[in-house]
């Protein structure tokens, strides 16, 4: 399973963006919300995004609700549209404070990484007060490479991988 581990980590690390699924307050209840954002990924498989509070999803992120992320192969790169490689992660959410100090995550270091990946637009975005940064820490996930090639991922280091299988005729 080391090969699968290496593949899914590489798949995350090369992604420029991620789909984000949140749950938001809506008419006294909740409603699902899906969006995307450019992202960076660190060596611990945490995903970071920089988004405006003007976006609907941001209120759910500020509330630090659990979130689902999906990294997915582009339609142009896939051989078969029904078999796009994808990585789905279930994550905790944390807003990154702009303050500095030992108890804070390194805002400046993350901004430097965003700038290296996406260019000067990041300097403009972080200068705007409505832009917030969030970290998604994976709890568990599923890596899907094709038919019969799905793998559950779990563990503190997200390194425990098992092939998903079921018997023919078995209901999922």
Language model feature labels by segment:
Residues 25, 34-37, 58, 76-80, ...:
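Catalytic micro-motifs at enzyme active sites that drive phosphoryl/nucleotidyl and oxygen chemistry
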Residues 1-62:
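An N-terminal domain-cap segment
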Residues 56-116:
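Short, structured beta-strand-loop surface elements
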Residues 1, 14, 53, 92-99, ...:
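Domain-wide signal for the mature, well-folded portions of proteins, strongly enriched
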Residues 14, 43-44, 64, 127-130, ...:
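Short, well-ordered loop/turn elements at secondary-structure boundaries
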Residues 3, 105, 109-113, 119-172:
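C-terminal edge-of-domain segments
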